Amino acid sequence: MPMASVQGWRGKVLVGLLALLCLWPLMAAAQDKPLSAFYRETWTTRQGLPHNQVNAIAQSPDGYLWLGTWEGLVRYNGLEFHVFDRANTPELKDNGIRSVRAASDGAVVIGTSRGGVTVKRGDRWRTWMEKDGLAQEEVMDALLDRQGRLWVATESAGITRMDGEVPVQFNERN
């Protein structure tokens, strides 16, 4: 009797696993939806973007969407756009935004095409340029690592890591 109950238990598990394996493709196929099945909204200069080309998108922990365009940084709250550019944000040295990254602590890291890199923390903005140790002001991407160090990938001069106030350069020579 104990042997029969063990075999019965194993049989049920085997049948259950086989059923799951047979249903797996159906479950996966049920999740494939055409793009038209999803809600889609298009934003252009008509809705408030400063430029129709969006180069980067990030979402900060507080829910804002951050968009990088050739005419400035945009914060979107779901209803309206707020544009940050050289005219209203002197810390942004260039309107051409190539990269935007949102850090887990709420900081927003902004890489510009000719104005270095800027980090926004709350209402404070800080910009790094060549005079601050960047290898180049033409930034392709930038981010903060888990230790809070700023890493900046430049257009043609390698990578700069900011350890506090001390820049460390990584390029073809080192």
Across the structure, where does each feature detected by a protein language model lie?
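Carboxylate-rich, polar loop motifs that coordinate divalent cations or form catalytic acidic clusters
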Residues: M1-N174
